[in-house]
Regions:
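An acidic/histidine-cluster motif and surrounding catalytic segment
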Residues: 1-91, 95-253
Length: 253
């Protein structure tokens, strides 16, 4: 029995992101969490849903028997499905738009047309280092509900996932270190307590405290706080490096 199947839900000749071929929405079978937002449906030329029957309802290869590995394997299957496409948007089923302002997406589309990239995230937590007035590089990435991934990068990720027996977390283990983001969070998710939430790395109570303090368990505008903190961490890193270099110079004297 095939544990995954696909359904096309929209096609357009006037996508918001002209440099993206396809959007794949990763959804559990029988889930009602996805909001059929016309903006999401028109992000790219074609939008499909990948339905996942789940490891409890459908026996999967590689002994997939826990939530974290099932999430990684689900991305792996989506990468297999999209082998013939160039840039692809991947959205988890609870992803939703924070900002609809078209000019933000136009800047992202222009960036993709002029620059090589591996992964662009529409909203993540991490350490942000400024590239220019609009874009940041992301280290220590967490949260992967909405990203654009290039064709070459998907091939590399699929191999790494399989070689690693689908262990780890999609964002922290596989996406980290090659990610860029826009200056504002654009496509976000809320973080109610779920089975997947309870499988995250790190201290569960610290994770939960951060979610409550930022408000992203109930209000998507809390992502503004996450982005402010992520940018601040990037600035602090630069300050730490400068202090280290100054101390090193004085030590050598």
């Amino acid at each position: 029995m095939d544990c995954y199947y696909y359904k096309t839900i929209n096609e357009t000749n006037s996508p918001i992101l002209k440099n993206v071929d396809l959007t794949v929405i990763l959804m559990m079978e029988n889930s009602n969490r996805f909001k059929y937002d016309p903006f999401i449906l028109n992000l790219s030329k074609k939008t499909v849903i990948q339905y996942n029957k789940g490891f409890r309802a459908c026996k999967k290869p590689f002994d997939i028997n826990e939530v974290k590995r099932d999430v990684v394997y689900t991305y792996y299957k989506a990468f297999e499905y999209t082998q013939t496409y160039n840039n692809v948007v991947f959205l988890e089923e609870d992803a939703e738009i924070l900002y609809y302002t078209r000019s933000h997406y136009d800047k992202i589309d222009e960036y993709m047309s002029k620059n090589e990239f591996s992964i662009f995230t529409f909203a993540s937590n991490g350490i942000f280092t400024k590239i220019d007035n609009d874009f940041y590089s992301v280290d220590m990435m967490r949260a992967a509900q909405a990203q654009i991934i290039s064709k070459d990068e998907r091939l590399k990720l699929a191999k790494r996932m399989k070689d690693n027996n689908f262990e780890g977390e999609t964002d922290a283990t596989y996406f980290d270190g090659k990610v860029i983001t826009y200056k504002y969070p654009l496509i976000v998710q809320l973080f109610p307590e779920t089975e997947n939430f309870n499988s995250w790395s790190g201290n569960k109570y610290i994770n939960k405290l951060g979610i409550i303090l930022s408000g992203v368990d109930r209000d998507k505008s809390g992502w503004e706080i996450i982005y402010m903190c992520s940018k601040l961490r990037g600035q602090l890193n630069i300050i730490y490096i400068m202090i280290f270099m100054i101390l090193l110079i004085f030590y050598r004297k």
